[in-house]
Amino acid sequence: MKAVHFGAGNIGRGFIGLQLVKSGYDVCFIDVNAEVVEALKTRGAYTVGYAAEEAAVEEVSRVTALNSQTEAERVVEAIATADVVTTAVGPTLLARIAPLLAEGLKQRTTTQNVFVIACENMIEGSSHLQQEVMHYLESTPGNVFFPNAAVDRIVPLQHHEDPLYVEVEPFFEWVIETKALPDDYPVFEGVTYVADITPFIERKLFTVNTGHAIASYLGALFGKETIAESLQDVRVRRGVQSALYETGWLLLEKYGFDPKDHSAYIQKNIKRFENPRIHDEIVRVARSPIRKLGPRDRLVKPARELMDRGIEANGLALGIAAALTYSDPNYSEYSELNTFIEQNGIQETVATYLGLEADERLSQLIVSQYEQMHPMSDSIA
């Protein structure tokens, strides 16, 4: 069995590619990092380490790679004969890989089903990828399926002498939606299959991603450098817990999760964030602020839904305000956001980037919190 995976980064090697190999697939990674691609070609294997008390390593073989910039024709050929195509490139890059993916699907001559799965931190990632691919196809072939998925594993920024070595946390979750799939859908090791993935995507997005993001922005506000360090500060911990209790209430209201089970889920994820063996830097977790502050993402969406139900989203508003105070000169999105705030003010920024009008109660909560913490962070201690 053959799998093509777009993205030979840490998530690709340390999570998706690893599980595909464990499930019996020969994996061809697609990437633009020449060093990583050549190393995968030459060695055909790499090592995954686990950040746990009992440190362990795992050898991953039956892998190769192609450079999508210099070997586009071979990438198309690989897609044309693959059983499975997966991605872990980041939501903003799905449009960039769509032309190659579309061409590969066009050139398929077999009637065998192929499954394209976007393993990204976003709602309905595969559906979004399908829309991007359809810009280059007249119609979706009947034997091509785009099941949506939810994925979860913390893989921090890291640097090793071996360009292929990657260290990950032991925990992972990969959920795939079976709705509209044929009976012969692929079964991967360690993957959960559900008829409706929406509750699982939102549970993960509104717990793991919301909590992680707020820990990073509040941590930065108080001078921390890593997520684990941030959670040691009672002010950050209290802020994260407050936001996750709010999103927890929303998830129970919408999907009927068991209260005890969800409370345990929250605590389990806070413990994951606290793992001292994972050096997860705030600069990594805080990236892509414009997307994360968007009206359909991990912060504003649950806050707005809570407010619509008559619940004050104070914890989420605090996290959103902290995100608006954060700055990183190495990322253009922060330059854009910070410049817009300086030139237009916080109220107009909230309207433009968060989609919240000035008369909305949530907007007022966010602006009030922002004005209290900016520029003096001690005002919210």
From Swiss-Prot:
<feature type="binding site">
    <location>
        <begin position="3"/>
        <end position="14"/>
    </location>
    <ligand>
        <name>NAD(+)</name>
    </ligand>
</feature>
<dbReference type="InterPro" id="IPR013118">
    <property type="entry name" value="Mannitol_DH_C"/>
</dbReference>
<protein>
    <recommendedName>
        <fullName>Mannitol-1-phosphate 5-dehydrogenase</fullName>
        <ecNumber>1.1.1.17</ecNumber>
    </recommendedName>
</protein>
<keyword id="KW-0560">Oxidoreductase</keyword>
<dbReference type="GO" id="GO:0008926">
    <property type="term" value="F:mannitol-1-phosphate 5-dehydrogenase activity"/>
</dbReference>
<dbReference type="InterPro" id="IPR013328">
    <property type="entry name" value="6PGD_dom2"/>
</dbReference>
<dbReference type="InterPro" id="IPR023028">
    <property type="entry name" value="Mannitol_1_phos_5_DH"/>
</dbReference>
<comment type="similarity">
    <text>Belongs to the mannitol dehydrogenase family.</text>
</comment>
<dbReference type="InterPro" id="IPR000669">
    <property type="entry name" value="Mannitol_DH"/>
</dbReference>
<dbReference type="InterPro" id="IPR023027">
    <property type="entry name" value="Mannitol_DH_CS"/>
</dbReference>
<dbReference type="GO" id="GO:0019592">
    <property type="term" value="P:mannitol catabolic process"/>
</dbReference>
<dbReference type="GO" id="GO:0005829">
    <property type="term" value="C:cytosol"/>
</dbReference>
<dbReference type="Pfam" id="PF08125">
    <property type="entry name" value="Mannitol_dh_C"/>
</dbReference>
<dbReference type="InterPro" id="IPR013131">
    <property type="entry name" value="Mannitol_DH_N"/>
</dbReference>
<dbReference type="Pfam" id="PF01232">
    <property type="entry name" value="Mannitol_dh"/>
</dbReference>
<dbReference type="InterPro" id="IPR036291">
    <property type="entry name" value="NAD(P)-bd_dom_sf"/>
</dbReference>
<dbReference type="InterPro" id="IPR008927">
    <property type="entry name" value="6-PGluconate_DH-like_C_sf"/>
</dbReference>
<keyword id="KW-0520">NAD</keyword>
